[in-house]
Amino acid sequence: MGKKRVLYVSQEIVPYTGETTMGEVASLLPQKTQEKGKDIRMFLPKFGTINERRHQLHEVIRLSGMNLIIDDFDHQLIIKVASIQKLRMQVYFIDNDEYFLTKHMFNNEDGSFMSNNDERMIFYCKGVIETVRKLGWKPDVIHCQGWFTSLVPMYIKKLYAGDPLFEDVKVIYSVFDNTYDGV
């Protein structure tokens, strides 16, 4: 039997989204898991706050080019990748200019909750799953961290229930600093 495969899906990861407790945990937990011999893949939304040049993000052409249907409209899925050098770990970024170009993660400049966060969350969660499918990478465990990832467990158990890639997967959802109402 090969290495256990763990998919980490988060809304924040240091060094990309700033130094928050959630971002630190989302960086350290995969690192420690990898040090124990597990095969790790990490996913993060490509928020407009993430500096592509500084973090050396580049598009993965073979994975990009899919469209996801959200609210009856096609939206282009762009996949980018970067490495956390000191950890020797790759991070995949789910991108779409319509949803993630803004310079704010979840709130508008005035501090109000973005009105399209629901669509952004749907796009991100579906984008992660579709990218894993396109990679053909069968995870043993999927660990979702933060409210923005909360649809992944439901999608895996309901929408993708018959998919052999996710047939025996264990799903963990970590609620972390759940300050947003309705989650």
Name every feature range the model reports, one short phrase each.
Residues 1-183:
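Catalytic cores of nucleotide-sugar-dependent glycosyltransferases that transfer UDP/GDP/TDP-activated
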